[in-house]
Amino acid sequence: MLKVLIPTIMLFPTIWLTPPKWLWSTTTAHGLLIALISLTWLKWSSEVGSATSSLYLASDPLSTPLLGLTCWLLPLMVLASQNHITPEPIIRQRLYITLLASLQTFLIMAFGATEIIMFYIMFEATLIPTLIIITRWGNQTERLNAGTYFLFYTLAGSLPLLVALLLLQQTNGTLSLLILQHSQPLALTSWGHKIWWAGCLIAFLVKMPLYGVHLWLPKAHVEAPVAGSMVLAAVLLKLGGYGMMRMMVVLDPLSKELAYPFIILALWGIIMTGSICLRQTDLKSLIAYSSVSHMGLVAGGILIQTPWGFTGAIILMIAHGLVSSALFCLANTAYERTHSRTMILARGLQMIFPLTAVWWFIANLANLALPPLPNLMGELMIITTLFNWSPLTIILTGTGTLITAGYSLYLFLMSQRGPTPKHIVGLPPFHTREHLLMALHLIPVLLLMTKPEIMWGWCY
């Protein structure tokens, strides 16, 4: 654990002491080195139950893929932000990268934590840098509104979790995951226990987000700068799914009956948010709603609590993290050139930027879960689990996949195909930096296709 945590903490003096000329290249290189070191975790993830580096930080097959994703994302965020942060004063540039690095530190400690209370503190700590990034570097004035939504939804959701954890500590005497998974199941019988069960899960369902408590997500995504959107889509939503998987161990006997309404909401959310996507005009908003739809599938897979459901959920979380982050980067490159997020105003970009159209195409196909890609693997596993649990769910999940394919192709056709409007003739060309950024997002997705067992979680 420390082989990644210490270099990440060493990023802070690097950011503040590097000469302005070398700031971006140094931090990107440093971030990529950390990302490469973090890949060594994947090697051991499947053989051992829990590779413990200390009593408080450990990595097991469930957290390892998410830790790798977190480390992989920092250099990509730095690469993506370079264009629109460079004109600002050097102090602000340093502060921006510091916030991104602090976010990575908190996330590594959240995914590696063995104590649930440590996980909770880090889960909450990620809120602060994200909030500053959205409200300080967002594009429109609505960013303050988005920040308020984000703050209040997350805080209101996670306060019951704190109370629930303190109660669990009181009854069990420990909050260590290493001990809790071997302790006796709790005899949860009364109404109070049912409220406690809901308190444990509601924070994660708001973070996922479950349909119904998802309103903060489109706002936060649309108003955040590109790095904010990337880290929000790729890792912060996955904190919710990861936390649910960890807590399910403790909540066992009650989940059988109480999970029903949440599964129904998640499945209904797949259809509803997909339908909203079909009517979107705003590029980033469409990608944000598609995230809600995918995470609904993940929530359903986790709440059913079968090995296949868990495996499908973690595969879909990793694949969706890379793909939605790539889509946000592409949306940002289009926004930086045309200064508009409305899809109708920027059509026919394939004629001007053919290689970028290829990146759009791959990202959209991955988003709609094209066969050999890991997205399909995760979705199929979850859909199979849901079908096994109740055959009627195939109506909802089947319609959901159909709508997903519909809006993904709609997004591609609207932004890339069609006649090029007269007002977009003199656009600056794409940089190698942007092509590298897209390659670093999409090549891992294609490579995971060849060895999916590194992200199968416990079930391998």
UniProtKB/Swiss-Prot annotation:
Topology versus the membrane: Multi-pass membrane protein
Which parts pass through the membrane? Answer: 20-42, 61-81, 93-113, 114-134, 148-168, 195-215, 225-245, 258-278, 285-304, 309-331, 351-371, 394-414
Keyword annotations from UniProtKB, A to Z:
Electron transport, Membrane, Mitochondrion, NAD, Respiratory chain, Translocase, Transmembrane, Transmembrane helix, Transport, Ubiquinone
Query: In the Enzyme Commission scheme, what number(s) does this protein have?
Result: 7.1.1.2
The entry's localization annotation reads:
Mitochondrion membrane
Top-rank taxon: Eukaryota
Name used for this protein in its record: NADH-ubiquinone oxidoreductase chain 4
